[in-house]
């Protein structure tokens, strides 16, 4: 944390160009091993005029423009660079306070990954700049130092200049910087992942995590919705949330700002502030390269076919596409130019079509090597995409990869990924989608012979039926638009042609768009309730209400024991919990087919369900009966390796799309620092399990505790199996490095009970959290009255830990001060201590904290109810009620000395039995606002998590 005495660097608005160029050069050097041979001045890429104008607007008004209109290839990803520099200016007092977080939201998973990767690369460059202590600090280092001043962490780890986040799958993967709430941050998200969190119902999140994630993504945040015309409902929803936040109490920080970025605006609101590219005004020297892109050579070639029907896997489309690819390859090979990459792009409408095209190219030996054609679709497992990116890093840049001759893709490549194809083959799609696909060709305008072939029906009359995911009217309009473009003297699909003859907007998939109102938000904010049924967010998030748009995921594991109880035990252990990295994205239709699958003996293989952070065994219905369970968006099924076929070319597909030869899959390895040993899966049982033979699980647990070292922890199953010689042996055990263990519990309930060092006294912990809360509030610029309320709440947030049952669980000395956390315990020891304690299952210490403070009104000030709320919700529970009443919470004889049991019981009955707590929650939400209260709770939780992370 930057202390008040630390001098901040000097940064001026005029240095944005140098920052932009320096960051671009640093990224280029990090991604390319070969040195840049161009003259130094030619190497520098300065911002375009429109990018400078956006920064000027932010610096002048303290808010982002509502809309950015910029054609494909004009550098919309620079919103990240602008965000970082604007915050650096704000940090040194050279610009007004602006949102600390930027969330780039885009509707393709691969694009979200691309945005996240770029953010991580920028972070790497800035961290490297901080280590350069030679001479006068350059602009990168000064910006990094300015951004670093927003951090409040104080441990052995150096603070980052900014944080990154990434939510693109069906699992909550702890990839949001909720603990560093004051930091500048860049977050990449899909529309569903962002939108569900904006409405307090984060897909894949635990109930306790929901309010914290909502606060992070909707307060002190600018959400940039890329290609907003593809997500009109989400745009309406987030804009309405931003409006309603203006009715809430003013905390002194920016509320949600929403920016739509697109080449085809989705609204015609004349009151919106719009900035962007004017293709008629590109005379500035800095716009020379942009002019090359806008007027690049992209010849349009229409290829009509008789048997076009818009269906997946259409053989005529596949054959015509393969034929066009062959001609492009022959042309490129004849033209030489082997020193440059000339990758041919192919973008089609369906995964089945993409798979068929790749299979045809490989089968017909169109290319010398199968590896020369790569498949890229949105339903790839992140682990597989990582491997592809690591193997072909330059493929995902405008430089290109010479070893890849063809990329076959679906809509994944329509938006945002910085590929640069020499030529493109695509099939008829809505005009706005085609415009995006055309943008993947000759992006920099360097080529003079690039062509775009569009496979289309022989006649517009052939487009009569919908061809999901597209409507007939949109395809028909696109056909007419292409004919108009083709009628020009030199048919082109470059950005200038798109401006002169704009693509026809797709027809709305809904008659009316829904906007959330105040009562909706109050209801959604009841995040800890157990409703009969979760609200269907499609109404507020999706342009289409088709149920099949809902997504889930599939995971395969090769190390689960056949004993289902032992397998559940592994999956419920935090180290081995499902992760987004190993999840195959799949729609609910695919998941349902997996559930219905029977092997050759008519047996349904076992499946595990991961939903909202909880693991359960899927209960298949008996023959002739309906299952009592049903799938929901965000559900993830876990399968044993090979038990159910569901992939083709490594992509989750329907059963009718399966290949004739079964796909070979591999399970994703566990992170570094974790090693799992399962008896029945172990290749060398004599070596790995010999010392545990004949021991009960309890005896093994004690032995493993003694074997744990300062750098490694060992945990074991509480279940046993029968060894080959008939002796008892544990089902599994694991070795975990302490660094991995510390990371796995950060922010969890377990972190509230242990540190991996010395015990922590309760008074010390609460004072530290209160002080960190004060620092956070000051850093954020919170209004003083709310800073005081937060500090009071933090000072007493763990009072409930004084309960003697909790102290016994921590192993506290009755003659010494109360503990906040035990010391020198592994996670496994903490779990065992809790299970053996006198505390009932589900008991919440923060519920008792709120009660004890409510019984001592002298401890709280003006905002009494707000303080109580922040205390009671300090771990995400109690919104709007707690699961347990006064009798469950209190037990006579276990209260700390000085507390009157009867008086406290009476107060607890009033709060948790009669309903005063529910009323308190309702009133504070109405008085302060659901987003404001969630944000204040999140600040206190961040302070608590930071102090715990630092071992206090």
Model-derived features: positions:
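Divalent metal-dependent catalytic cores for phosphoryl transfer on phosphate-bearing substrates
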Residues: 477, 753-759, 778-952
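Conserved pre-motif I regulatory segment
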Residues: 3-69, 82
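C-terminal helicase lobe and adjacent C-terminal extensions/tails of nucleic-acid helicase motors
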Residues: 330-341, 356, 363-397, 429-430, ...
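Interdomain hinge/linker at the junction between the two RecA-like core domains of SF2 helicases
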Residues: 251-257, 261-333
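Conserved strand-helix element at the start of the C-terminal RecA-like helicase core
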Residues: 101-115, 119, 332-363, 374-375
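Conserved Walker A/P-loop ATP-binding site and its immediately adjacent core
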Residues: 97-124, 128-142, 192-196, 231, ...
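Inter-Walker segment of RecA-like/P-loop motor cores
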Residues: 127-207
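SF2 helicase catalytic motif II
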Residues: 192-250
């Amino acid at each position: 944390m930057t202390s008040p005495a630390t001098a901040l660097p000097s940064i001026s608005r005029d240095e944005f160009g140098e920052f932009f160029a320096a960051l671009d050069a640093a990224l280029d050097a990090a991604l390319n091993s070969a040195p840049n041979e161009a003259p130094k001045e030619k190497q520098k890429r300065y911002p375009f005029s429109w990018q400078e104008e956006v920064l000027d607007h932010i610096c002048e008004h303290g808010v982002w423009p509502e809309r950015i209109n910029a054609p494909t290839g004009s550098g919309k990803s620079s919103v990240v660079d602008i965000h970082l520099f604007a915050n650096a200016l704000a940090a040194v007092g050279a610009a007004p306070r602006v949102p600390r977080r930027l969330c780039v939201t885009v509707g393709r998973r691969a694009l979200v990954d691309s945005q996240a990767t770029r953010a991580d690369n920028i972070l790497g460059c800035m961290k490297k700049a901080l280590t350069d202590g030679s001479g006068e600090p350059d602009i990168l280092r000064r910006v990094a130092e300015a951004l670093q001043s927003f951090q409040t962490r104080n441990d052995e780890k150096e603070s980052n200049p900014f944080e990154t986040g990434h939510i693109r799958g069906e699992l909550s993967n702890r990839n949001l910087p909720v603990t560093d709430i004051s930091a500048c941050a860049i977050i990449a998200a899909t529309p569903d992942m962002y939108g569900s969190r904006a409405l307090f119902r984060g897909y894949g999140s635990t109930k306790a995590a929901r309010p914290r994630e909502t606060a992070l993504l909707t307060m002190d945040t600018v959400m940039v919705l890329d290609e907003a015309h593809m997500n009109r409902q989400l745009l309406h929803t987030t804009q309405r949330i931003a409006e309603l936040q203006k009715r809430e109490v003013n905390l002194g920080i920016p509320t949600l700002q929403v920016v739509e970025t697109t080449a085809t605006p989705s609204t015609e609101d004349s009151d919106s502030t719009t900035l962007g590219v004017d293709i008629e005004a590109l005379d500035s020297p800095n716009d020379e390269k942009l002019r090359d892109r806008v007027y690049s050579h992209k010849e349009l070639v229409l290829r009509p076919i008789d048997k076009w029907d818009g269906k997946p896997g259409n053989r005529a489309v596949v054959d015509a596409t393969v034929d066009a690819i062959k001609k492009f390859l022959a042309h490129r090979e004849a033209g030489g130019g082997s020193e440059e990459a000339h990758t041919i792009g192919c973008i089609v409408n369906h995964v089945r079509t993409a798979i068929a095209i790749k299979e045809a190219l490989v089968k017909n030996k169109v290319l010398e090597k199968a590896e020369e054609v790569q498949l890229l679709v949105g339903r790839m497992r992140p682990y597989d995409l990582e491997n592809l990116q690591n193997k072909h890093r330059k493929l995902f840049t405008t430089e290109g990869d010479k070893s890849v001759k063809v990329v076959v893709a679906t809509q994944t490549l329509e938006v945002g990924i910085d590929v640069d194809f020499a030529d493109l083959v695509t099939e008829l799609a809505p005009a706005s989608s085609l415009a995006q696909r055309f943008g993947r060709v000759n992006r920099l305008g360097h080529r003079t012979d690039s062509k775009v072939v569009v496979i289309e029906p022989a006649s517009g009359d052939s487009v009569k039926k919908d061809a999901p995911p597209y409507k007939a009217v949109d395809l028909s309009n696109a056909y007419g638009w292409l004919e108009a473009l083709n009628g020009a003297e030199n048919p082109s699909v470059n950005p200038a042609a798109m401006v002169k003859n704009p693509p026809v907007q797709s027809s709305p998939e809904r008659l009316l768009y829904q906007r959330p109102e105040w009562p909706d938000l109050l209801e959604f904010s009841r995040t800890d309730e157990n409703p009969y049924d979760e609200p269907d967010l499609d109404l507020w998030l999706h342009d289409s209400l088709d149920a099949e748009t809902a997504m889930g995921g599939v995971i395969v594991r090769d190390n689960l024991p056949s004993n289902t109880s032992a397998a559940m035990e592994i999956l419920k252990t935090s180290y081995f919990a499902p992760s987004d990295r190993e999840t195959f994205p799949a729609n609910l239709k695919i998941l349902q087919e997996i559930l219905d699958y029977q092997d050759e003996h008519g047996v349904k293989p076992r499946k595990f369900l991961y939903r909202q952070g909880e693991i359960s065994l899927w209960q298949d219905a008996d023959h002739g009966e309906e299952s009592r369970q049903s799938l929901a968006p965000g559900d993830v099924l876990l399968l044993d390796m090979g038990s159910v076929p569901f992939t083709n070319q490594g992509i989750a597909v329907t059963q009718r799309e399966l290949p004739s030869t079964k796909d070979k899959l591999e399970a994703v390895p566990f992170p570094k620092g974790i090693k799992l040993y399962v008896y029945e899966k172990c290749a060398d049982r004599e070596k790995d399990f010999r010392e545990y033979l004949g021991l009960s699980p309890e005896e093994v647990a004690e032995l493993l505790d003694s074997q744990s070292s300062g750098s490694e922890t060992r945990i074991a199953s509480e279940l046993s199996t029968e060894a080959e010689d008939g002796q008892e042996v544990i089902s599994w055990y694991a070795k975990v490095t302490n660094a991995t263990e510390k990371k796995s519990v950060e922010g969890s309930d377990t972190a509230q009970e242990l540190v991996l060092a010395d015990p922590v006294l309760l008074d010390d912990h609460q004072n530290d959290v209160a002080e960190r809360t004060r620092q956070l509030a000051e850093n954020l610029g919170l209004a003083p009255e709310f800073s005081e309320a937060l500090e009071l709440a933090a000072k007493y947030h763990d009072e409930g830990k004084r309960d003697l049952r909790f102290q016994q669980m921590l192993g506290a000395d009755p003659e010494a001060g109360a503990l906040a956390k035990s010391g020198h315990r592994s996670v496994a020891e903490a779990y065992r201590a809790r299970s053996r304690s006198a505390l009932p299952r589900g008991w919440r210490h923060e519920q008792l904290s709120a009660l004890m403070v409510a019984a001592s009104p002298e401890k709280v000030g003006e905002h009494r109810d707000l303080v109580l709320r922040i205390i009671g919700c300090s771990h995400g529970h109690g919104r709007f009620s707690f699961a347990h009443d006064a009798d469950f919470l209190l037990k006579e004889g276990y209260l700390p000395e000085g507390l009157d049991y009867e008086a406290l019981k009476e107060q607890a009955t009033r709060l948790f039995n009669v309903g005063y707590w529910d009323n308190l929650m309702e009133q504070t939400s109405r008085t302060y606002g659901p987003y404001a209260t969630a944000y204040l709770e999140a600040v206190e939780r961040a302070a608590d998590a930071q102090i715990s992370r630092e071992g206090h």
